[in-house]
């Protein structure tokens, strides 16, 4: 099994300094982050970037403990970009390092999957 959706969410919070093991993230916070993950992955897919993410049929069907379906080499792009989204939704300014890592990782998977963006 690869990355679970919970692992992606936890690592995304970690990128913005809110690791669950330190900050005791509530189930509501984790579910909200999962919805953002699902929405981000739906957007990526709509742009032609299909990396195998297991999309739920509806937001209420999404499960944190489900395998994400993504290959290991895509995990950093997913959790770092999710970290950017989570940070902006809670008013936390992401570090410049996170912005660079998220951008570079995203560009790497665009190249790997042969997707060109305008």
PLM regions and their residue ranges:
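Elongated alpha-helical scaffolds
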Residues: 72-86
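Aromatic-residue-lined binding/catalytic grooves and analogous aromatic/hydrophobic interfacial grooves
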Residues: 105
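Conserved short "hinge" loops at termini or chain/domain junctions
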Residues: 1-72, 89-101, 109-117
């Amino acid at each position: 099994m690869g990355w679970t959706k919970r692992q992606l969410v936890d690592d995304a919070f970690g990128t913005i300094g809110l690791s669950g093991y330190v900050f005791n993230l509530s189930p509501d916070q984790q579910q909200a982050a999962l919805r953002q993950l699902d929405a981000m992955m739906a957007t990526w897919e709509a742009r032609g970037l299909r990396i195998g993410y297991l999309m739920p049929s509806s937001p209420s069907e999404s499960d944190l403990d489900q395998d994400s379906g993504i290959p290991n080499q895509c995990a950093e792009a997913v959790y770092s970009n999710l970290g950017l989204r989570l940070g902006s939704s809670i008013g936390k300014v992401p570090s410049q390092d996170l912005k660079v890592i998220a951008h570079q990782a995203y560009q790497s998977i665009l190249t790997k999957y042969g997707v060109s963006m305008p």
